Amino acid sequence: MEALNALMFQGALLSDSGRLYRLQLPGGDVQVVERWSGSERLSGGFEWWVDVLSTQAGLPLEAWLGRRATLYSRLADGDESPRTGLIHDAYALGSDGGLARYRVGLVPWTWWLSQGRHSRVFQERTLVQIVEAVFADYAPMASWQWSEETSAFLAQARPRSHCAQYRESHLDLGHR
């Protein structure tokens, strides 16, 4: 009976109702946020680290990598403000007394563009064709589109005779 009461108490503590923050993970699984921190930069993306508590040890952390997760912050009026990113790192911090603690790192999809160096040559391709070819590898995680304001400019852009990507990241090529 005492063990059952302890489990019910833990379940009540780990409810996300009334909490300021909650993290929705792949598959709709919601975790209670213990704390979170991060940084955001203009033209540089963001990185958030979220510590969550769970009654389950051994959550499938590897399966979360590259998947979308949303950190919700409850506002003063009761509405929620979402911050969505892709999980680039997840690991267990330890467990104690039936609670497991995990840390999850969230970044924008463009972070993956910075991972790795590539070399390739584009010939007689427009800017649109080059960018779309580079971003095609990231289609499952990418969330982007050309803005309407750029359509007139892009329609006038002539093909480039030669554009080389030599040992640089896709992000660096995109910035260039």
Over which residues does each language-model region extend?
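Amphipathic alpha-helical and helix-coil boundary elements used as assembly
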Residues: 1-176
